[in-house]
């Protein structure tokens, strides 16, 4: 025969335990301190409330009906909300009032002006330009973009040299030879 666990069931015959009795907690008396028994009972009630979480069983379908009824019963306060229509899509953030137009600001592109001498030095020391010029000297053909870049850089170099008054003319060999012959070597000793 299987063992059966003994349980104590509260019935009319048996005296009720203090734990089983519901204790009415005095709410209005603040000056009186609660006894240990009342504090325990209150703690038990709080624990029962905390223990029960979530929705009641079967409330999934009835919850929507209750919400609809509750909303219908609630009176709308005419002071709440605005009657002004709110656009759902923002088309113009800073739209001016009717008749008030804001003139558009003219943005001038500011080009940082370098010193012509410094710019000329940068163009002459440009490695990409030097490589392309070496390729041209070797007889290779350049792509259209590279050729355009080389032409633009050379035009700018010529323009800067004109501004600065630098001449590109090489002295003829005869002039160099004459100056070499005229130089007194004793000056350099």
From Swiss-Prot:
Q: Residues annotated as region Disordered? A: 1-81
UniProt organism field:
Pasteurella multocida (strain Pm70)
Q: Does the keyword Magnesium apply?
A: no
- UniProt keyword Transcription regulation present: no
Q: Which terms does the UniProt entry file under GO BP?
A: ribosome biogenesis
Locate the transmembrane regions by residue number.
none
Return the Basic and acidic residues bias intervals: 9-27, 35-46
> Polar residues bias: where?
60-71
- Keyword field: GTPase activation, Ribosome biogenesis
Question: What's the protein here called?
Answer: Der GTPase-activating protein YihI
Q: How does it assemble?
A: Interacts with Der.
What does this protein do, in the record's words? A GTPase-activating protein (GAP) that modifies Der/EngA GTPase function. May play a role in ribosome biogenesis.
Recorded hits in NCBIfam families, A to Z, give: PRK05244.1-1
GO molecular function: any one?
GTPase activator activity
Similarity comment: family membership? Belongs to the YihI family.
Q: Where is the signal peptide?
A: none
């Amino acid at each position: 025969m299987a063992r059966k666990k003994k349980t104590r069931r509260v019935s009319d015959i048996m005296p009720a335990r203090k734990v089983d009795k519901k204790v009415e907690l005095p709410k209005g008396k603040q000056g009186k301190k609660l006894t240990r028994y009342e504090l325990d009972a209150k703690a038990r009630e709080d624990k029962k409330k905390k223990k029960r979480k979530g929705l009641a069983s079967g409330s999934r379908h009835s919850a929507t009906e209750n919400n609809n009824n509750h909303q219908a019963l609630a009176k709308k306060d005419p002071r709440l909300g605005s009657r002004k229509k709110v656009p759902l899509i923002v088309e113009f953030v800073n739209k001016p009032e009717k008749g008030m137009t804001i003139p558009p600001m003219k943005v001038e592109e500011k080009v940082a002006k370098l010193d012509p001498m410094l710019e000329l030095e940068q163009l002459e020391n440009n490695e990409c330009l030097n490589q392309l010029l070496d390729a041209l000297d070797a007889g290779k053909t350049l792509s259209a973009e590279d050729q355009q870049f080389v032409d633009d850089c050379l035009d700018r170099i010529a323009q800067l040299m004109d501004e600065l008054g630098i001449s590109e003319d090489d002295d003829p060999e005869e002039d160099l030879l004459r100056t070499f012959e005229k130089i007194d070597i004793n000056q350099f000793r």
